[in-house]
């Protein structure tokens, strides 16, 4: 084997290892996951399946990966709620969609809405969910304070009709408005 061939093989081997290591560091390692069935809420005509959200453990926190369709375009408030229910309940004499889920999950008693990485906010505050013009949502969001699937089992995920400013001002709970879609995390 001549010197040029040997040098070319050595360079090729080094490049292959470098590319493999770079690929390894730029991906989120996959861990255990839960698939949550999500339904659009309709207390009068019954809920309708709109897809799933897969919750996966990663080195950076829990990753919520939606595979949803049939939703209204735009940013939507996306949260973990305290109860494992998507049932309607009565509020002020009116049947309200998804009220059985309770409020935003707040096991540490923060009593305020905020960013997903903010220590003094509800633990159930997630990044807003983006729904494209065709009604689909597939972009994952990261919840860095949530580390294990057992942290969220026995609760529900909720998608609100409006966006989320991650604050209680000017409207409480990010201003997301009514509950639009929900899934129980089992």
Curated annotation (Swiss-Prot):
It catalyses: 2 superoxide + 2 H(+) = H2O2 + O2. Homodimer. Residues 1-22 form the signal peptide. Disulfide bonds join 86-182. Keywords: Antioxidant, Copper, Disulfide bond, Metal-binding, Oxidoreductase, Periplasm, Signal, Zinc. This is Superoxide dismutase [Cu-Zn]. The keyword Transit peptide does not apply. The keyword Disulfide bond applies. GO terms for cellular component: periplasmic space. Belongs to the Cu-Zn superoxide dismutase family. Its cofactor is Cu cation; Zn(2+). Its main location: periplasm. It is found in: Periplasm. Destroys radicals which are normally produced within the cells and which are toxic to biological systems. Cu cation binds at residues 79, 81, 104, 160. Binds 1 copper ion per subunit. Binds 1 zinc ion per subunit. Its EC number is 1.15.1.1. Zn(2+) binds at residues 104, 113, 122, 125. GO terms for molecular function: copper ion binding; superoxide dismutase activity.
């Amino acid at each position: 084997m001549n010197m040029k061939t040997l040098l070319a093989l050595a360079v090729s081997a080094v490049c292959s290892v470098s590319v493999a290591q770079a690929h390894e560091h730029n991906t989120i390692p996959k861990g255990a996951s839960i698939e949550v069935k999500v339904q659009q809420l309709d207390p009068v005509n019954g809920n309708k399946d709109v897809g799933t959200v897969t919750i996966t453990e990663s080195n950076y926190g829990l990753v919520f990966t939606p595979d949803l369709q049939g939703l209204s375009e735009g940013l939507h408030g996306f949260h973990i709620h305290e109860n494992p229910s998507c049932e309607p309940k009565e509020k002020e004499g009116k049947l309200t969609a998804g009220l059985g889920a309770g409020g935003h999950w707040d096991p540490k008693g923060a009593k305020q809405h905020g960013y997903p990485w903010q220590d003094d906010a509800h633990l159930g505050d997630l990044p807003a969910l983006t729904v494209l013009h065709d009604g689909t949502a597939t972009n994952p969001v990261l919840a860095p304070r949530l580390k294990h699937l057992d942290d969220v089992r026995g609760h529900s995920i909720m998608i609100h009709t409006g966006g989320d400013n991650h604050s209680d001002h000017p409207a409480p709970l990010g201003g997301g408005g009514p509950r639009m879609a929900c899934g129980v995390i089992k």
